[in-house]
Amino acid sequence: MEGKEEDVRLGANRYSERQPIGTAAQGAGDDKDYKEPPPAPLFEPGELKSWSFYRAGIAEFVATFLFLYITILTVMGVSKSSSKCATVGIQGIAWSFGGMIFALVYCTAGISGGHINPAVTFGLFLARKLSLTRAIFYIVMQCLGAICGAGVVKGFQQGLYMGNGGGANVVASGYTKGDGLGAEIVGTFILVYTVFSATDAKRNARDSHVPILAPLPIGFAVFLVHLATIPITGTGINPARSLGAAIIYNKDHAWNDHWIFWVGPFVGAALAAIYHQVIIRAIPFKSRS
């Protein structure tokens, strides 16, 4: 028995550096096993000569194309039915958006980071997680993918597409532009904050399961935001999604409030980046110490 007790003592001493739970994780030993990655350069000319740079852009294009194709088709399926009980309803639409984000982030995270959203790209750029060159390239490819995805849906079901709003985001009757803007800001804040938390490099360094599970909370956040804001704006929180549907549908009312679906998500993404980097992680203060 004495030998076994000694083994237990040795084991406890050997693994005493394991990560504490809760606020204890904020102790003085934080820097022993983790070093903050350097910020991405604003411009990185070498990227333009790398195939991985263009491969990542293509991945963003294809992912956003598939995202718009599945989600807009789902919206059309609900819109054409006179009885919402006979279709998947709002919950089904929310699941299609959240489920596709879950699947596509899982598929593309190792190639491009799995942004699939200019607001996510913008937030990560503000946090210096990627260069301006890559951010602009991603946003362009995301918008092109969204336009093509919505265009294919219209090609399959033109009458249904044009007769049921084309999945374009508009502020619903009974709500003001301020309501719509606020819903888009808060909804995008939730999404981008979840992205920062789920992909946090410090957590990844300490918990090996975090990178594998990251797509799940991101997709679930998209699902929940859609449940809450579909009745208000149809839920944008993704400027590429809103732009693609608006361009292909191309009716006046789809453009009247279109600015909301760019300003709202970008403001929400900026707030999420500031909150996570400055308040939660205190990155600026660490760099001075």
From Swiss-Prot:
Q: Which family does it belong to?
A: Belongs to the MIP/aquaporin (TC 1.A.8) family. PIP (TC 1.A.8.11) subfamily.
Q: Which organism is it from?
A: Oryza sativa subsp. japonica (Rice)
| Name the UniProt record assigns to this protein | Aquaporin PIP1-1
What further note is attached to this protein's record? Recovery of PIP1.1 expression after chilling is increased by pretreatment with mannitol.
What PANTHER family does the record tag this protein with?
AQUAPORIN OR AQUAGLYCEROPORIN RELATED (PTHR45687)
Q: Which InterPro entries match?
A: Aquaporin-like, Aquaporin_transptr, MIP, MIP_CS
Q: Where are the transmembrane segments?
A: 58-78, 93-115, 136-156, 178-198, 212-232, 260-280
Alphabetical keyword list: Cell membrane, Membrane, Repeat, Transmembrane, Transmembrane helix, Transport
User: Motif span (NPA 1)?
Assistant: 117-119
Q: Which GO terms describe its biological process?
A: response to water deprivation
